[in-house]
Amino acid sequence: GIVIVDPDNDTLNEYIKKHRQATEYRDRLGGLVGKPTVTTDGIPLVLKANIDSPEQVDAAIMAGCEGIGLVRTEMLLVQRGRYPSADEQTEWYSDIAQRAYPLSVTFRAFDVGSDKFREGIPHHEENPALGLRGIRFLLYRPDIFESQICAILQASVHRNIRLMLPMIATLEELEQAK
């Protein structure tokens, strides 16, 4: 988020309007909690949430989500400003898995790169937008990848955890990740 000190009237009115719109939207969605999630032709859907932190699990479940479809684990890096230890990761992943239990949780392995946390990425990339990110970064830095996988495995005591590997483009990348 951002902090605006001493906003002018136009800025203040803009944020008051945004807050009002968000409140109205949240109120409309609140009326849907507990109702079946189906397409217009009656096909049932499973509604899962995408989250950035353990605190968001509770809100997702209260909103009627049937699990956590994606945990953006790279946000742990952004929040801390560094790569966390395996123990710190295990604690974070365990907190999320326990809050969601018995619902499933899908953790996406660190998807760092051009738009997010760049520590450990070479300064020159041929194509920074598509270059060394996702699984390619994790294969480039096996120490980080292995630490994260170990932490996720240690956090899986309730067996409600799934793993997503980001941006796999080739069969070779998948085989290397195994």
Regions found by a protein language model. Give the residues of each.
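Long, charged amphipathic helices and adjacent flexible linkers at domain junctions
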Residues: D6-G42
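Conserved alpha/beta-domain cores
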Residues: L29-K178
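Conformationally flexible catalytic loops at phosphate/diphosphate-handling active centers
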Residues: G1
